[in-house]
Structure formats: structure tokens, C-alpha cells
Amino acid sequence: MSEIKDVIVQGLWKNNSALVQLLGLCPLLAVTSTATNALGLGLATTLVLTLTNLTISTLRHWTPAEIRIPIYVMIIASVVSAVQMLINAYAFGLYQSLGIFIPLIVTNCIVVGRAEAFAAKKGPALSALDGFSIGMGATCAMFVLGSLREIIGNGTLFDGADALLGSWAKVLRVEIFHTDSPFLLAMLPPGAFIGLGLMLAGKYLIDERMKKRRAEATAERALPNGETGNV
């Protein structure tokens, strides 16, 4: 149970692919102009990670070490092609919006990295959980960045959600403030870099505060009964 918890915590927070490893920055910065685009690519990446980790882990005993990387790439490319066709069939608007970044998941360092570092060494169930956790960690980072950029740039949230979730999702669109022209700095790549930098700083501050609290709690437990840390 502790190993399962550790895999989840590592994927979502401690070893977050976007905020700690800084992998997959090209789609992270390019696609997150809206919350819908960010969520769509994040979920597609999560599905690819989960399925490829599961497949590679299942076949790990029959995969020759000398040619494992080409085999991994073939498996990843097959899964990405299937996911791309699903998005094309059921979310064509999102497919057009994401464009080349869907097939580029094949070359995403996150996917290949987890295949080599985790799936090739662990069992199928734990590998699938690792892929799902890593994918959801990246999705959360993309969604937060996309939401911030969309709110600051257009004053809206979930604009175009119907492209991802269907026509009913039009009701999810929220206009936070009205603007006649978008704030281009937030919508263009410089805004993505600034937003990512602020998110990295925020995660660092949260980690430092949590580390300080753990140190204080450990110090209090180490004191004899009835004593305090104050002089």
C-alpha cells in the first residue's frame, strides 16, 4: 500500500514531470493558451502513458535489452496513433486545435522516460498506475497554466469546452470579465514562460513551507514531555 501511495505522490507532486523534471515543455508552452486545449492534450498524454506503461511492462520479459528503445517507440507510436484517431473521430474541433502536438506525443520525453525508468522494471498494475499518476500530474500543471493564460488573456474560462466534451459543455463557459481585445502577452509564448516560472516559484515555496513544518514537528516530538522549544 505504501508503494502505491508513493507512486501516486511522486507522479502528482514530488516528481511532477512539468514542474520538477521540466519535461515536455514544448507542448506545455505551446498548447496551454486555453484551459480546454490544456485539458485535452493532458488527458491524451495520460491515456498514452497509462497504456504504454501497461504494454511495455507486460512485454518486458520478452523484450531484448539491445533493441528495447526501438520497441518502446513502436509501442508508443501505435498507442498515439489510436488516441489520435479517437480524438479525430469524437472531438474533431479539439483535434484541429491541438494539431501536430498530438502525434508529437510519440517523441515526448515523459513517455519514453517512464517506459525506460519504471515500466521496464515493475509489474503491469504498478506501471499503469505510474503512467496514470505522471500523466495526471502533467495534466494538472497544463490545466492550471492554461486556465491562468485564458483568464488573463481573454477574461474567460472553459471557452470552447464543447470541442472536448460535446455540445452540452457550452454551459461551462464562464466570462470572468469582458474585454474587447485579448491581452496578447498572456496568449503568446512569452506569457506561457512567465506563467510557468510563477508556477515553479509557487511549488518551491509550498515545498519549503511543508519541509519547515515537518522539521518543526520532528523537533517537537524529540523534546522531553513538558518542555517547549522556546527559551
Swiss-Prot record:
<dbReference type="InterPro" id="IPR003667">
    <property type="entry name" value="NqrDE/RnfAE"/>
</dbReference>
<keyword id="KW-1003">Cell membrane</keyword>
<feature type="transmembrane region" description="Helical">
    <location>
        <begin position="182"/>
        <end position="202"/>
    </location>
</feature>
<comment type="function">
    <text>Part of a membrane-bound complex that couples electron transfer with translocation of ions across the membrane. Required to maintain the reduced state of SoxR.</text>
</comment>
<comment type="similarity">
    <text>Belongs to the NqrDE/RnfAE family.</text>
</comment>
<feature type="transmembrane region" description="Helical">
    <location>
        <begin position="39"/>
        <end position="59"/>
    </location>
</feature>
<keyword id="KW-0997">Cell inner membrane</keyword>
<protein>
    <recommendedName>
        <fullName>Ion-translocating oxidoreductase complex subunit E</fullName>
        <ecNumber>7.-.-.-</ecNumber>
    </recommendedName>
</protein>
<dbReference type="GO" id="GO:0005886">
    <property type="term" value="C:plasma membrane"/>
</dbReference>
<feature type="transmembrane region" description="Helical">
    <location>
        <begin position="63"/>
        <end position="83"/>
    </location>
</feature>
<keyword id="KW-0813">Transport</keyword>
<dbReference type="GO" id="GO:0022900">
    <property type="term" value="P:electron transport chain"/>
</dbReference>
<keyword id="KW-1278">Translocase</keyword>
<keyword id="KW-0812">Transmembrane</keyword>
<feature type="transmembrane region" description="Helical">
    <location>
        <begin position="125"/>
        <end position="145"/>
    </location>
</feature>
<keyword id="KW-0472">Membrane</keyword>
<feature type="transmembrane region" description="Helical">
    <location>
        <begin position="18"/>
        <end position="38"/>
    </location>
</feature>
<keyword id="KW-0249">Electron transport</keyword>
<feature type="transmembrane region" description="Helical">
    <location>
        <begin position="86"/>
        <end position="106"/>
    </location>
</feature>
<keyword id="KW-1133">Transmembrane helix</keyword>
<comment type="subunit">
    <text>The complex is composed of six subunits: RsxA, RsxB, RsxC, RsxD, RsxE and RsxG.</text>
</comment>
<dbReference type="Pfam" id="PF02508">
    <property type="entry name" value="Rnf-Nqr"/>
</dbReference>
<dbReference type="InterPro" id="IPR010968">
    <property type="entry name" value="RnfE"/>
</dbReference>
